[in-house]
Structure formats: structure tokens, C-alpha cells
Amino acid sequence: MSIKVAVVDNYDSFVYNLVQYLGELGAEPVVVRNDAVDVAGLRALEASALLVSPGPGRPEHAGVSSAAIAELGGEGLPVLGVCLGHQCIGQVFGARVVRAPEIVHGKASPIHHDGRGVFRDLPEVFEATRYHSLVVDADSIPDCLEVTAWTAGGLVMGLRHRTLPIEGVQFHPESILTGAAGHDLLGNFLELAAATASPRR
């Protein structure tokens, strides 16, 4: 499906793995650094979807990421946040981002999920790679968000906005250790974005 996806690069080495997957799935990714563009510049790209990448640090240090989620996502542009991007989604809508019980760097964990949205048709439980020291606090999720994925220990691994086409995943779908489920998750996001862009198609 040939849809343009604006990719906000939060200075992370995984960004081009995401871009490669998007290209393999037929999308047209356009990568912009988080400090090289503002929301108006992103809007001018006329993309059909926005992907906010992983990266170091906290959401408030992720340049245009949070403003883009709030403004463009708030206008109905489909958004997928990955790792730091997922944390940005949580914080934008009022959740707290806190230290994780343990720092994980390249750890594969079983992910449980609700089988909807970007998780449609994925295995009920799949292994995904995690690189993070922060998590969205499960006790602070606002009414507008729902938890869509979690670890066996109850850590939040996915979020979805209840009325806007915005989803986030804490794990890395583009990691080789995540495997086919990550590729399929990104494919689901592109399908959702295409359906949002062309509701009567």
C-alpha cells in the first residue's frame, strides 16, 4: 500500500530498521529529525500517517514528537509511537512516564495483547524485543487511553486512544528478535492508516 508516512527520528539507530520495514510493506517513509522540523513542517509533508520513533531520554526531550502527536494526532492523523514514541503518547494524554522496575537492553519478552488495532491477527502471545528504562505507569492511564499490550508482570507494552487513530508500543517491532509479528504489526498500522485516509474505499 503506497501511503506516505512521516517518520520522526528521535536520534535512534533503530529508525532505519523501521524505515526498511515500512518500505518492504509498500509505504513511502519520509524521515525528519525531531529538532529539524516543527508541526507545520510535518503537516506540509501531507503524509497519511505519522510514526514517532524510539530514542534516548524522556518524552519532554524528544523535540517535536509530543507536539506532533497532540496536534496532528488530535486532528485525526493515524499515529504509531514506538518505545519513546509510545511514552510520548502516554504523556501527551496525561499518563505518567516512570522508571521501569528493571532496565532492559535487548531483552526478548512475551507480549500479551488485546488482538485489536495494530495487534489484529497476531499470535495471542509473541516474543518482542525491549530496550527501555522507562515505562508508562499503569496506574496513571487516563480514560481516553486503553492498555492494549502488557507483560506477564503487568508492565504496559501498548496503548491505544479510544477515539483517535493513535497507538503506541513499548517494544521494538523492527528488531530482528521480534520477528514476523513486528513486521505484521507495522503492516496492520499501514492498513489502519490507509482505511482512515480513504474511509469509503
Predicted regions and their residues:
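Catalytic beta-strand/loop cores that center a nucleophilic Ser/Cys/Thr
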Residues: 115-163
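Short, charged N-terminal beta->alpha structural module
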Residues: 5-25
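Structural signature of beta-strand start/N-cap positions in the alpha/beta core
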Residues: 4, 28, 48, 78-80, ...
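Acyltransferase
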Residues: 171-201
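Conserved hydrophobic/aromatic beta-strand scaffold that supports enzyme active sites
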Residues: 108-110, 156-158, 168
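A short beta-strand-loop structural module common to alpha/beta enzyme folds
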Residues: 28-36
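Cysteine-nucleophile active-site neighborhood
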Residues: 3, 44-121, 186
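Histidine-centered divalent metal-coordination motifs
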Residues: 83, 132, 172
